[in-house]
Regions:
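Conserved SGNH/GDSL esterase-like catalytic core that processes O-acyl groups on lipids
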Residues: 2-6, 15-127, 132, 142-150, ...
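Short hydrophobic segments within beta-strands
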Residues: 8-9, 136
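Short glycine-enriched loops at secondary-structure junctions
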Residues: 137-141
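Active-site His/Glu-centered metal-binding helix of metallohydrolases
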Residues: 12
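Single conserved hydrophobic/aromatic residue that forms the stacking wall/gate
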Residues: 159-170
């Protein structure tokens, strides 16, 4: 039986490419040779099954007033159950949490991630084993990146990040 790894994330997990000139195929989604999830699958080999659950715009817990069902918290039960048994869950979220419309600071984003982790642990998808969750910090937003989607919130991600100590404190 293969070891099942589920990668739950946002556009970084989906493989969204903001500038098609940066993509070998010239499209808006990186190909299987470029996406980190596919590279992980290749590196691990046939004894593992790496599954992408990436969605552009996905947040940890923040309900988007413009686009519905974008928060991982409200959909994680169904997502995790649809992929059970999960041996490792990789969470790579937080970039979209800094959108200006959410008004969240680093501590609030960290608390949201902790809430999502606790919810994921409670889902019966682990085959009777202890939940195994790896949180990967999203890459920094490049300086000067600002648009109508992210707003001024992207400046927050340049200079702050949720404290891993604060996230561990509630365990």
């Amino acid at each position: 039986m293969k070891t099942h790894i589920l990668c739950l994330g946002d556009s970084n997990t989906h493989g969204y490419c903001a500038d098609p000139k940066d993509n070998a195929d010239g499209g808006i989604r990186f190909n299987e040779n470029e996406r980190w999830t596919c590279r992980l699958q290749t590196a691990l080999g046939d004894k593992y099954l790496v599954t992408e659950e990436g969605l552009s715009g996905r947040t940890t817990v923040f309900v988007d007033p413009i686009h519905e069902s974008m928060d991982a918290l409200s959909v994680c039960y169904a997502l995790l159950k649809s992929h059970e048994v999960i041996d490792l869950l990789i969470l790579m979220l937080g970039t979209n949490d800094v959108k200006e419309r959410f008004g969240a600071n680093a501590a609030c984003i960290g608390a949201g991630m902790e809430r999502l982790i606790q919810k994921c642990k409670s889902v019966d998808c682990w085959g009777g084993k202890t939940p195994n969750i790896l949180v990967v910090a999203p890459p920094r937003i490049k300086e000067g990146f600002h648009d109508e989607v992210m707003g001024d919130g992207c400046v927050c991600l340049l200079y702050t990040s949720p404290s891993p100590r604060d996230m561990r404190r509630s365990r």
